[in-house]
From Swiss-Prot:
HAMAP family for this protein: Maf
GO molecular function terms listed in the Swiss-Prot or TrEMBL record: dTTP diphosphatase activity; nucleoside triphosphate diphosphatase activity; UTP diphosphatase activity
UniProt entry tagged with the keyword Oxidoreductase: no
Active site location: D71
Gene Ontology CC annotations of this record: cytoplasm
Full protein name: dTTP/UTP pyrophosphatase
Length: 193
């Protein structure tokens, strides 16, 4: 009997991405405190740790499952850029990103219960924002779209209009690197195909 697949996430984007490939899964909110910007830890360590916390929390209740967790951060000049606190903060973040490259890191953790076997991985993509105007920033922020997103933009929505180019995995930038997730699941004997 195949184990239930559980996505440990509150993210509408991760839910959509996993749903779009047509597999059956259950969404469970992990309710964990995520680690944010830290001078002592790298973005790789932070996203891996946050993804792992999510699957471990959900594993407390689901003892016969494959549990998927993920975390994504935006990094500019070595600094983690989180979700904006308010519209003013979103404008500030988007001005900092304007006409520059930044990196997006996503950590993915997959746990099989009851064995508690865990695999983790981190994917990095590079994004170049275009030289958009202050007026474009204000119009974009007024849509409300950037308010729940690391880096204050959503590449899968209107935020795509702010991006000049990407290098790497598009789905990583959205928040769930599907190809890497599939390779982790393959090691448990599962496939997204």
């Amino acid at each position: 009997m195949r184990k239930e697949i559980i996505l440990a996430s509150n993210s509408p984007r991760r839910i959509y991405l996993l749903g779009q490939i047509g597999i059956d899964f259950k969404v469970v909110s992990p309710n964990v405190e995520e680690e944010g910007n830290s001078e002592r830890r790298s973005p790789v360590d932070i996203v891996k740790s946050n993804a792992l916390k999510k699957v471990q929390k959900v594993a407390e209740e689901y003892r016969n499952a494959i549990i998927i967790g993920a975390d994504t951060v935006v990094v500019l000049d070595g600094e983690i850029i989180g979700k904006p606190k308010d519209e003013r903060d979103a404008i500030r973040i988007l001005k900092r990103l304007r006409d520059r490259y930044h990196f997006v890191f996503s950590g993915v953790a997959v746990m099989e219960t009851p064995e508690e076997k865990v695999l983790t991985s981190v994917v990095r993509s590079k994004v170049k924002m275009r030289d958009y105007s202050d007026e474009e920033i204000e119009r974009y922020v007024a849509t409300g779209e950037p308010m729940d997103k690391a880096g204050a933009y959503g590449i899968q929505g209107k935020g795509a209009l702010l991006v000049e180019k990407i290098e790497g995995d598009y789905y990583n930038i959205v928040g769930l690197p599907l190809v890497r997730l599939n390779s982790l699941l393959n090691r448990f004997g599962y496939s997204l195909l």
